[in-house]
């Protein structure tokens, strides 16, 4: 049984009521804004995870069509804007297997999103963009 992965969730980043652009998704995202400094680092203008990032709130790094979590990497295959919600399909690899994953993304401000999945279990996760 596949569990909802927050890594794929980050790929759904878009500004509310605006056309989706790859640049809108770029950045470091987490469920706990106060943990940004414990999760992410920026060296030579590149974002990366700190060594023990998975021990804190966890998060996602979006760079173009690439979405990286602490245990999984995804490539966005498609984004479809349905008005208030955006539908994202990504091909994700955990190092062992590759699978396509679908998520819905809702924006609640410039730096806040909610990612949701209906299968295998309905899940909603709010994310905030870290100032990096």
Language model regions located:
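Short, solvent-exposed loop/hinge segments that bridge or flank secondary-structure elements
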Residues: 25-26, 31-65, 69
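Short, exposed beta-strand-loop hairpins at the edges of beta-sheets
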Residues: 104-106, 110-126
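Contiguous, well-ordered beta-strand patches that form the walls/edges
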Residues: 57-109
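N-terminal signal peptide c-region/cleavage motif recognized by signal peptidases
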Residues: 15-17
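Short, solvent-exposed mixed-charge patches
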Residues: 130-132
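Boundary at the C-terminal end of the N-terminal hydrophobic targeting segment
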Residues: 20-24
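Bacterial N-terminal signal peptides that target proteins for export
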Residues: 1-7
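Hydrophobic helical h-region of N-terminal Sec-dependent signal peptides
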Residues: 8-12
């Amino acid at each position: 049984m596949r569990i909802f992965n927050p890594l794929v969730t980050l790929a759904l980043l878009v500004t509310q009521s605006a056309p989706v652009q790859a640049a809108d998704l770029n950045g470091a995202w987490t469920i706990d804004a106060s943990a940004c400094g414990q999760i992410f680092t920026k060296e030579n203008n590149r974002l990366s995870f700190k060594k023990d990032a998975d021990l804190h709130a966890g998060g996602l790094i979006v760079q173009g069509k690439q979405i990286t979590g602490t245990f999984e990497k995804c490539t966005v295959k498609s984004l479809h804007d349905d008005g208030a919600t955006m539908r994202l399909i990504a091909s994700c690899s955990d190092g062992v297997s590759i699978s396509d994953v679908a998520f819905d993304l809702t924006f609640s401000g410039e730096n806040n999103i909610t990612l949701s999945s209906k299968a295998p279990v309905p899940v909603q996760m709010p994310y905030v963009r870290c100032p990096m």
